[in-house]
């Protein structure tokens, strides 16, 4: 059985470069821990939803990168993507919460924490989760805090404690 993993959830147009950098750093810092990020982890021809659900079954941490346009990103018809039941970011976070995966919101580049009334009903809990901030100017400091938080969850899971 593979060790518990870390899942990186993000919007490509919002925090894509941060997600890529974070995945690289997670892989370096935790070489024996699987790190799931859609572009690198889903094989060609594989069903996205199934791959995401499978990954979340083995993850103990989901890092939700929330950038300045995370809440307001729209689809081609101008509808807010978070209101689309088929939105993958919504699916990832909702599924993680349903499976009691630790969700760590990371507010990127000055993004504000979403308020409950801004979120779909099944994501309201996200507004109550303590978030970390991450910015370009303080990246090393912010990233070290995030890595320490992830390490604590991984260690508590290895010790058999609840996340």
Language model features by range: what are they?
Residues 112-124:
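Glycine-rich, charge-decorated loop segments at or immediately adjacent to ligand/cofactor-binding or catalytic sites
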